[in-house]
Amino acid sequence: MRFFRRTRLLFSATFITGLLLLAGALLVGFDIDEEGRVRPASNGVLAQGIENSTDECVVCHVDQTPGIVNQFGESDHFSNNVSCSDCHLVEEGYAGSVQHPNEEFYVLPLSSTAQCAECHREQVAQFNLSRHALPSYVAYAGTDPLTEDQLAMYQSIPERGGIDSRNRNSLHAMEGEAVTRFACETCHNVGRPNPDGSIGNCTACHIRHEFSLEQVRKPETCNACHIGPDHPQWEIYSESGHGISYLTGGDDWNWDAEPGNVTTVDFPAPTCATCHMSGFGLSATTHDVGDRLTWYLASAISSRRPAWEENRVRMQQVCLACHSNNFVDDFYDAGDALVDSINTWVMLSDWMMQPLKDNGLLTAQAFDEPIDFTYFNIWHHWGRTAKFGSWMQGADYVQWHGAYEILHDLAILREEVDAKLEEAGLEPLDLPDNFPSIDAARDVVGSQSE
Ligand code: HEC
Ligand code: HEC
Ligand code: HEC
Ligand code: HEC
Ligand code: HEC
Ligand code: HEC
Ligand code: HEC
Ligand code: HEC
């Protein structure tokens, strides 16, 4: 009895508190949905001008989604009379659209590149030609899910190739959808096809709904994806002279400078965007991030790109705004020589694995025995890291996360290969005494220069 009385008391107390909360919420203007979740109806700090807007979407969404309206109010879109409708309102039946809650019209809940293309045709065309578009998606999904048109578009990208996929896609299959939607896909969906057939997601870099130049020019934007053991561009940049200039003095830079011809007055040192995208010096703004690259650095064994000579000129024109001709030429010669050394070590690792392949001593399944990881890490982590580190000035990544790790894993690879050969009654690898030095690697596989 006592128990029931207590629970009844508890129940009434909860009920009354609930009622009070509800009344309170209604009084101060909170919004409660069918599931009992409460949302603040207005947070009061509206961007200048937006409170006078007569746009029906804005008028209602100020209460429904105040965060979005606030960000939109800060944007150049709002001050240039671009409206919510321009990006979201579509015909009934438009692929990916839904009927707007309580209204007759249809909206795209996630606006697509097709809407941006109405006004920013050039940026979209450049983006579509880059590895941020379909190649990013194909890197984990393969080409099977592409429509005929998308396949043709993918095949028309001159720089889509160059990087052999060496088992990487098998990680996607091994880990399964529940994991990869938070992993591979979070980064690689920058180039995923949308329901309406357009490609990619501009908001992978341009955070909605402000679409601010300052935000997208800052290197933190790129570090959403260009980070970690296999592509540590953010870490490398942070320890370079350029990154240190940004981290210690960037507050004073002219982040909102008009795009097209940004100068050294605006940016005394470069960010990722300056070197790879901004109109700077004689190089025009581009959304094709491959447009200034010489090498396929992400490759196991790097080769030069189809249009590498023109690309290199475009990158060097950026450097030349701040550095001398000789400085830039010396730097490029040194970078090319480093690529040659890393290529040589990776070829040595291929040479070491060859007898296992020839004698059927490896399992068919990728990543099921330690040797698969050792072999993979040599090029996918350490080789890449050393190359990126040299080209973007991160000494620690060239040395301790790069060359040193290569030597370490080559020594382990030798033990792992020899163990398998001996188990099969075969001779161990015949390697020179100074293995795994670069001289030994050159002796075994020859020089790779030019
Ligand atoms: C009378 C109020 C009202 C008007 C007018 C209005 N909206 Fe909405 N809108 C809402 C509400 C309420 C939601 C649902 C919010 C939620 O689910 O949390 C919503 C949701 C949305 C969504 C998300 C839909 C989804 O399924 O995720 C979009 C996009 C949107 N509105 C765009 C617009 C555009 C564009 C206009 C003008 C053409 C507009 N809205 C006009 C109240 C309004
Ligand atoms: C310049 C184009 C553009 C304008 C203008 C714009 N949006 Fe969006 N909006 C987008 C994009 C792009 C996305 C989806 C981003 C993604 O895929 O991650 C989005 C997402 C949304 C979402 C769903 C995501 C969420 O966070 O709930 C809502 C709701 C929305 N917008 C409402 C609005 C409203 C209301 C306005 C006007 C006040 C507006 N948008 C103006 C481009 C725009
Ligand atoms: C209806 C036309 C229209 C649509 C649709 C549109 N924009 Fe814009 N956008 C503009 C205009 C106009 C400006 C201002 C141009 C200027 O300042 O020179 C602008 C400016 C920008 C800027 C530069 C902001 C700045 O501070 O200068 C970015 C970034 C941008 N848009 C991205 C997008 C993206 C991404 C989409 C799609 C999600 C999109 N826009 C959709 C018309 C549009
Ligand atoms: C943190 C973001 C991130 C995650 C997670 C991620 N990648 Fe990547 N991936 C990148 C970036 C950035 C590059 C580009 C490296 C470069 O060019 O320096 C890349 C490059 C690649 C490449 C080489 C490019 C090509 O077109 O062949 C493949 C293949 C690839 N990733 C597959 C995957 C798979 C499969 C997964 C999941 C098992 C995955 N990635 C997870 C960001 C990511
Ligand atoms: C890899 C990140 C990234 C992606 C993805 C991206 N942008 Fe940009 N965008 C930038 C950067 C960085 C700038 C600033 C360039 C500069 O410094 O002038 C910029 C500038 C812009 C501008 C204003 C500059 C100008 O030349 O007028 C527009 C408009 C724009 N982007 C539209 C888009 C559209 C549309 C998409 C999707 C197809 C897109 N962006 C995808 C990084 C990106
Ligand atoms: C949402 C994730 C994401 C963001 C954010 C992002 N990238 Fe990427 N980026 C990728 C992926 C994935 C690849 C590899 C694509 C491939 O090769 O298949 C890539 C490749 C590249 C490449 C090599 C292109 C080539 O042709 O090999 C450059 C350069 C690059 N990104 C620069 C940038 C810069 C600069 C920024 C910031 C302004 C940026 N990225 C932001 C995911 C991202
Ligand atoms: C000083 C200019 C500069 C800055 C700053 C810079 N990069 Fe680079 N980046 C380069 C050069 C040069 C290369 C090598 C180009 C080549 O192949 O010739 C490169 C290579 C790359 C690659 C490798 C592409 C491939 O072939 O696999 C990626 C990805 C990349 N940078 C992204 C970034 C990101 C992200 C940032 C900021 C965190 C950044 N870069 C900062 C100049 C720069
Ligand atoms: C906007 C100006 C600017 C641009 C563009 C620029 N740099 Fe720099 N660079 C600097 C500054 C500033 C430093 C830091 C100098 C110091 O450490 O005293 C620096 C340092 C360097 C260093 C280290 C030099 C040393 O003595 O330690 C290298 C290497 C370098 N830059 C290469 C490049 C390359 C390659 C490019 C083009 C891909 C480039 N930079 C583009 C301004 C620039």
Sequence positions of predicted segments:
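Short sequence/structural segments immediately N-terminal
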Residues: 2-450
